[in-house]
Every structure is written in C-alpha cells, then in structure tokens.
C-alpha cells in the first residue's frame, strides 16, 4: 500500500532546470542593474521609470517616463530596463510591444523568491519578494496592444517584472519564435473579462446508451496572464519561475497551437494561486495546452504548484489538456503539486479532454500530488472520432474528492447519475466516438478518499459522433492503491458495441467500498468483440496478488464479461466469502481459483509470489 503525502521521487532524476530555477530569481535583477549602459552586443540599452519627469533620453541617468517612448526609441535586439519605483507610485501604463531580439527586464533585485514547498518533498514555491520598490508596469485600457501589458516578438525575453491589473493579459505572444518569460510577478489580469482559451466543441458522454450531449460552442475561459498562440511557425517557448496570482477573470498560463503551428514548450516552477471566475466566462484554468487544425505541441511541465484556485460555483481546472481536430499533443507533467480546488462539480485537478476530430495525444503525469477537490480530481475524456488518448500515471498520489454525484441506474447499488463526469471520481475516463482508442497506464500510484468512485471507465458510442464502434479501451494497473471509495474502486462499463477491451491489474489494493462494490465489469446493454479481463493468471500476464475484499454489497461483480482473478487475496485464507463474487448473467465466469492464503504486500501483507 502506498503512503499518503507527496510521492517519493528519489528514483527519478531532476532535470537541469531545477538548479537554474533556484538561482535565477536571485541573479536576474541584480545582473541587469549592474550592467549599466555597457553594450556588449552592440545594441542600445534603454531605461524607463515611473518616478521621473518628462524630457528624459532613455539613459540610466535620465530615463524615459512612458512605455510608449521606450517602445518607439528602441530597436531590435535592444535591452529595455524598467527602473524600480516605490509601490505607492502607479505603475507605468499603456503596455509595450517588443521588437525582435529585445529583452524587457525589471531592474533591481529579484521581484520573486523561492520558499518552502506546500507539501513535504514537493517543489519549492515561488512568491513575491515583498520589496518596497518594484519595476511595475500595466496596460489599463484596450487603446494599445488590445489591453495586454507586454506583446512578444521573435527571440524576446521578459524577466523580473511586476505586472498588475492589465485590461487583458499580462504577456501575449502570437507566432513569436523563441521566447522566454521568467521570474515575473503577475496579478489582477483580465479586468475586462475577455474570453481567451475556448475548450473546443465536444459531445459530452452520458450513461444513456448511444446518447451524447452536444456542446456545440465549447466552453469559454478567461484570457490568461501568459498566453502564447502559434499558428504558422515552429517555435520554442520557456515559461519559468513566475508567480501568477489573484487573477480577476483570467487563466494562468495558456499555450495554444493552431493551423500548422509547431510548438515545444517548457513550463517550470511556476506558482499559480487564487484565480477566480467572473460572470463573462464559463471556466477558469491554471495551466492549459491545446491543439487545433494540424498543429503539434510538445509540452514539459516540471515543478509547478497550484493552490487555492477557483471561486464559489466556478468551473476551475488547474491543469487542462485539450487536443482537437487533427492536432497532435504530447505532454509530460512531473513533480506537480495541486491543492484545494474551489468551485462546482466541474472543478478538476487535471482535465484531459480530446474534444473532436481524429487528434492524437499522450499525457504522462509522474511524481505528482493532488488533494482536495469538489469534482473529479483527474479526467481522461476521448470525444473524437478515430482519435487516441493515452494517460500514463507514474507515482501519482490523489487524495480527497469532496462530492458524491452517485452512479447510474444500472450500477450496484442503483443511482440517478446521468453523465459520466463531474461526479467526484478520483479518475473519470469516458469514450464516446467511433473508432476511438482510449488507454490508461497506472503504476506505483495511490487514490484514496475518493468520495464517489476511484476509477470509472465508461465506453458509450454517441450515435452522432462518427460511424462505427468504439475501437479499443485499455486499462493497465500495477502496484497501486485504489481503496476505500464510496462506490467502486475500479469500474469498467460498456453500453454500446466495443471492438476491444483489455484490462490488466496486478499487485494492487482494490479493497473496501463503503456503499457498493470494490471492483466491477459491466455491459448491461453493450457487447464486446474481444474482451480480456486479467486480474491474475490470465492471458495478459497479470501475476494477481491484488487485494479485493470489503465491499458493502459484493467484492467483485461482472455482467456479461469473463474475468480471470486467480492468485488474489479476498480478505480470508478461504478465498472469497460466499455471495461476494457475482457474475450476473449465466454463461459467463469469474475464475477466483488458487486464492492467496495470506495478504500480499499490496495490502501490507507478506504472501510471497507463487
């Protein structure tokens, strides 16, 4: 059984960005200040200050006093330094559009600093330095740059700035090649309530056979503090060490690929906290990635923390992944901490929704911790047609969902739930498009305190979502804990024709359901051409050694599926208790032979492998 708390990640190496993250915030401000007017690269160095009068020439001795002046005077490759001013002085207003190769840098000491992690063993958390004088800018109207404080260009850097209360975003880039955003303090963004990221249209999965609910206009989220759009170029993006907090109506960090854009992005050691949803949008998101058209996106997220995000009734998704159309999205999330989502039932720690089309995607989450959420903590939804989603969970801890939306009428016990998401699952997985392939690979992970189900997997082809059947559903669970859920710890159910189902579970604790059945496989209205469910000694190679007992009704139940479940622990040396393992339809079989005589390591026992 895996312990609670942040996962032990000693076996995982940290990338080189770790040391860079810890040292950058202490050096970037001081280094730019000490450089003075020297010009190593042959470019000009310009200064702008909120505390000087008019008539300056942009030098260190007589800075400009508006962003418009320094934007006009500076050229490609120049360095622009924002001079710190007392926090009682209004920030420089009007925003600035950078030229290629420019660096926009806040002078003076670092405006952010690293503090202790929120969870023991987690990544350090970046926050405000609390200095009396800061390099502050904003853009309070849409009169210039659409209300963004900074507009990026090719090969630009934005470092060590405090950006507060811009009309739209703090930093925006469109088809900007090779950009870096690091060590900034961003707050109060999107005072206008402008829509930014739009979750692409999708067919919402339900528990009614053949029925989906069309969400034709998608879901509108607020314009992000940092938004990078790429449609026609190939670019690399780095977003690191930023303190993104107290948003008015905006997402945190959004990366979007469109058309034929090609993006590689590194998002590291950012702290996102206290984002709220306003009335003009339907969602708010912490860190989001998206592909549409034929765009491609490769994202690496490392060492980020999200905490206390959302507002009453909000649709708050702290990590959001949205492939659509013919896009390709590959994402790795490592050493992430997410604590306390605030909002309604559609609030998630991580939502992975392939909205439509034949997009291809793969997301890996490793060495990460999620706690306290009023909706599904994790979601994998494959709503395309001919599309593929793969979710890999490696050393991931999920604790405490705080709502119970129940189960559908055909579940055990019967309930009244109608849609497959937003029920309070630790992980909800749904597929409803023709020819879809949906994969879960889970290892060395722990789900506890799931107030509805631990893992719910539903296959239900919506009749209006492509021609043909859902193609493949794969669930592979190894050395993990999913126990003590209100209803199911693991429930795989199919409502319409499915071509392939593969389920393999070994060395895992699936014990105890306070109100239902720990493990179940059901197709009350569906059929599966080829189904293999291997909980022990089956054809998929599971060694068993699972803990399956403690259900309020049954311990293991199946409807129209054969299940191999040898070499498992049923809470007793005598094997399953009478009436606790049930196949609901004659002609199918659950094989529980050769049961273990002692508890295996999965539930703190010492039964050796046979």
Predicted feature locations:
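Extracellular/surface-exposed low-complexity segments
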Residues: 31-41, 559-610
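Right-handed parallel beta-helix/beta-solenoid
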Residues: 30-69, 84-86, 599, 609-610
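Consensus "Asn ladder" position of solenoid repeat domains
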Residues: 161, 184, 242, 270, ...
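Parallel beta-helix/beta-solenoid
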Residues: 75, 93, 99-100, 132, ...
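Structural detector of coil-to-beta-strand junctions
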Residues: 95, 147-149, 169-171, 192, ...
């Amino acid at each position: 059984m895996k312990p609670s708390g942040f996962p032990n990640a000693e076996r995982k190496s940290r990338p080189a960005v770790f040391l860079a993250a810890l040292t950058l915030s202490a050096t970037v401000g001081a280094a730019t200040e000490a450089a003075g007017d020297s010009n190593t690269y042959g470019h000009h160095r310009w200064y702008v200050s909120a505390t000087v009068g008019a008539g300056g020439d942009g030098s260190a001795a007589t800075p400009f006093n508006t962003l418009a002046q320094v934007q006009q005077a500076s050229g490609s490759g120049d360095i622009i330094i924002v001079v710190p001013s007392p926090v009682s002085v209004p920030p420089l207003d009007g925003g600035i559009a950078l030229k290629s190769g420019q660096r926009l840098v806040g002078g003076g000491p670092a405006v952010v600093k690293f503090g202790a992690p929120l969870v023991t063993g987690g990544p350090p958390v970046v926050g405000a330095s609390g200095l009396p004088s800061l390099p502050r800018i904003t853009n309070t109207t849409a009169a210039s740059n659409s209300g963004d404080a900074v507009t990026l260009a090719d090969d630009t850097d934005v470092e060590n700035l405090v950006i507060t209360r811009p009309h739209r975003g703090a930093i925006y880039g469109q088809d900007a090649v090779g950009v870096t955003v690091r060590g900034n303090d961003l707050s109060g963004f999107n005072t206008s309530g402008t829509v930014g990221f739009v979750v692409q249209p999708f067919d919402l999965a339900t528990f009614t056979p053949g029925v989906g609910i069309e969400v034709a206009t998608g879901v509108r989220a607020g314009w992000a503090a940092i938004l990078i759009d790429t449609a026609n170029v190939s670019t690399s993006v780095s977003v690191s060490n930023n303190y993104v907090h107290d948003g008015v109506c905006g997402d945190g960090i959004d990366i979007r690929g469109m058309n034929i854009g090609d993006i590689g992005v590194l998002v590291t050691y950012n702290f996102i906290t206290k984002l709220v949803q306003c009335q003009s949008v339907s969602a708010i998101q912490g860190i989001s990635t998206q592909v549409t058209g034929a765009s491609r996106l490769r994202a690496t997220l490392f060492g980020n923390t999200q905490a206390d995000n959302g507002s009453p009734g909000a649709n708050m998704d702290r990590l959001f992944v949205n492939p659509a159309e013919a896009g390709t999205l590959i994402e790795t999330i490592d050493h992430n901490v997410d604590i306390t989502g605030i909002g309604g039932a559609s609030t998630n720690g991580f939502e992975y929704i392939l909205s439509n089309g034949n997009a291809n995607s793969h997301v890996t989450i490793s060495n990460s911790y999620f706690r306290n959420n009023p909706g599904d903590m994790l979601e994998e939804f494959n709503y395309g047609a001919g599309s593929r989603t793969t979710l890999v969970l490696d050393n991931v801890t999920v604790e405490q969902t705080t709502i119970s939306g129940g189960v559908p009428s055909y579940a055990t016990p019967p309930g009244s739930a109608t849609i497959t998401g937003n029920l309070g699952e630790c992980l909800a997985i749904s597929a409803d498009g023709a020819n879809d392939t949906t994969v879960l690979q889970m290892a060395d992970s722990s789900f506890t305190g799931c107030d509805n189900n631990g893992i719910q997997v539903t296959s239900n082809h919506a009749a209006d979502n492509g021609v043909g059947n859902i193609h493949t559903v794969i669930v592979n669970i190894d050395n993990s804990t999913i126990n003590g859920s209100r209803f199911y710890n693991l429930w795989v159910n199919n409502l319409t024709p499915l071509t392939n189902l593969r389920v393999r579970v070994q060395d895992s604790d699936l014990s105890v359901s306070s109100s239902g059945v720990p493990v179940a496989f059901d197709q009350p209205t569906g059929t599966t051409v080829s189904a293999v469910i291997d909980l022990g000694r089956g054809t998929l190679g599971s060694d068993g050694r699972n803990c399956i007992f403690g259900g309020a009704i049954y311990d293991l139940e199946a409807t129209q599926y054969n299940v191999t479940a040898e070499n498992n622990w049923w809470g007793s040396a005598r094997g399953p208790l009478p009436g606790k393992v049930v196949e609901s339809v004659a002609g199918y079989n659950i094989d529980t032979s050769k049961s273990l005589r002692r508890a295996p390591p999965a539930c703190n026992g010492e039964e050796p492998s046979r």
